[in-house]
């Protein structure tokens, strides 16, 4: 039996530069992790089946689940003769912009690597994971990083300054592909990647908060205005900075003082079912 944790990610920045020939967008984003985790357990099977056990019936346990697909890919890649049972204890909200599925897939690749004593490097696992999800390479490492290309090119950055994170997911789900289809690259939107990069380099918390920016945010807000209301609520309640993560709908706020963080948590707790008070990891 092997255990792995799969932490959620948040975007400090997210920019799309151009549409690639392969249909994907060229992206440039800075991400980090927070201490909201899914927990996964892996058991070898006597047959060759892949079985995903998960309590929530709204999360698929078949090939639509990224952890299942990661296991399938790993077993094919290393020509394994045994299957695996994957038990997932989910804490990360689903379809939230927090890369919960990608985190589970990355944890599966790391877990099976240990379970079957394959000895693959993290670089090899990241390359393998990139075949099924653009956030998976980042989730293999779980470090603060600048991700470019489709998300597979990773430059590790300094850990962010210590801070509380208030995560709040409105009662809706958003499909990333649907949001990416609506990107208008002719429309100017300033994403402060360079400022964020320098803020992390200098461990400058105030500059980090000022740099938070996400090109997808206005697109998701145009379809779901409650995202913007939630963000403004956090800022009015004392957040040093706030942003929608990924394609949304989760919004997070940053705070350095615990009392400040609890005030923000209480302010948004009434309007969302899923609100979490966590810490930056990076």
Swiss-Prot record:
GO function terms (MF aspect): 4-(cytidine 5'-diphospho)-2-C-methyl-D-erythritol kinase activity; ATP binding
UniProt EC number: 2.7.1.148
Keyword check for Transferase: yes
The reaction(s) this protein catalyses: 4-CDP-2-C-methyl-D-erythritol + ATP = 4-CDP-2-C-methyl-D-erythritol 2-phosphate + ADP + H(+)
UniProt keyword Ribonucleoprotein, yes or no: no
Enzyme class: transferase
Alphabetically ordered keywords of this record: ATP-binding, Kinase, Nucleotide-binding, Transferase
Catalytic center residues: 9, 135
Gene3D superfamilies cross-referenced by the UniProt entry: 3.30.230.10, GHMP kinase, C-terminal domain (3.30.70.890)
UniProt: ATP binding residues: 93-103
SUPFAM superfamilies: GHMP Kinase, C-terminal domain (SSF55060), Ribosomal protein S5 domain 2-like (SSF54211)
Example GO biological process: terpenoid biosynthetic process
HAMAP family according to UniProt: IspE
Reported function: Catalyzes the phosphorylation of the position 2 hydroxy group of 4-diphosphocytidyl-2C-methyl-D-erythritol.
Stated family: Belongs to the GHMP kinase family. IspE subfamily.
Name the UniProt record assigns to this protein: Putative 4-diphosphocytidyl-2-C-methyl-D-erythritol kinase
Source organism (scientific name): Staphylococcus aureus (strain MRSA252)
